[in-house]
Amino acid sequence: MTDWKPIPRPSPSKSHRMLTLLGPRHRYCDGIGRRSFLQIGGLACAGGFTLADIARAEAVAASAGRKLPWKSVIMVYLSGGLPHQDTFDLKPHAPKEIRGELNPIATNVPGIEISELLPQLAQCADKYSLIRSVVGQRDEHSSFQSVTGYTMDETKRDGRPSFGSMIARVQGPTDPLTPPFIDLFPTMQHRPYNSPNAGSLGASFNPVKADGEDIASMRLRYIEAQQFGRRRDLLEQLDAFRTAADRVGAMSQNYQRAFDVLASSKLVEALDVEKEDPLVRARYGKGSAKHLGDGGPLWNDQLLMARRLVEVGVRVVTVAYGFWDTHGNNFGHLKQHLPTFDTGLSALIEDLSARGLDQDVLVVVWGEFGRTPKINKDAGRDHWAPVQTALIAGGGVKTGQVIGSTDASAGYAATRPVHYRDVLATIYQNVGIDPHQFVRDANDRPIPILPEDARPVRELF
């Protein structure tokens, strides 16, 4: 596969078209049909700002003619737990009941092999590192360990915040018009998959949510693209929405912030992947916004949206991607869905590199655990907490390497065990935050970001 370059975005069309902020209808396993919509939730960066303040801030930013540098993170959470031995840590010499149906293929880095179902990722292996020895997880179906660095019990008991909320708390926004943390997780049927919020830091550090059911949030079905051409039109429209909200008593602090965020047309445009060059969007592929099982959608627009968001200054974007809880028909499931994953993730990695963003945007891809070495009677792999693989790209880290290894059955770490908290420590260090510092929560209590034994993965720096 040849290298590809980002294509300049076309100038906005003068033709009349609609900007859709409401996703397609999808149906959950419980049979309830729901719509995904743009939900602007708790937002720290715009708290207390009026629409006039936002407009003035935008004018100042425009006159400055530049933007400050920042570090961003895109985390792709693989809900359900990806089978590592069928994707990034194959064991072709193991017995058939362990190695399964898939074969390894060479990558563009000598000595590194991955699954035959990931040919595009194989051709950009020089742009990421694989940690094949991630340990320390509990057997719990939740995003909490991946997103907070703590177990679900610890997170709920102690109010541990999402790493995105912690980064928002410590570093704040890159500018007053841009939220520091946007969570693209949909509302998944299995509730522990859903992203935890700011916890003890307080609701003001909750992410902007791109899906949800909060009645007091903004729900916009369509906004005419041409309305964004004139600033006054947008402000008048938002003021009309505010007046209507006041009448029904729905004007909470978070609702106020929703209007402030929407006053920034650059954020709205970043969320509109229709504005991307068609060739770039085609490279990402599409997938579907429909949820898989009780997990996330296999929807590559999320990955493209994440890149567009970090470009406009969002510090953290979290994505829930696919459903990998393959207790049965593991190989049929992977043959159907890994090609879409391969297309989307390789596009994100290559796109960031081609745009020169690979030094500033860290990409972390992992689930809550791995899968069992031995294939079960239903041709599936069950939960396996002892080890999994994480993929790390961008952020200026060292790439084209494998860190750690597993035993002959991919069941346990054989060399260089990396605790999952070390991955979170790596994220914090990469964005310039000491993972062991204390911050003040909403009650002015000092809380540690991570335990003292969490250490950044040294091989990446």
Annotate each predicted stretch with a short phrase.
Residues 2-4, 11-461:
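Ligand-binding pockets and gating/stacking loops
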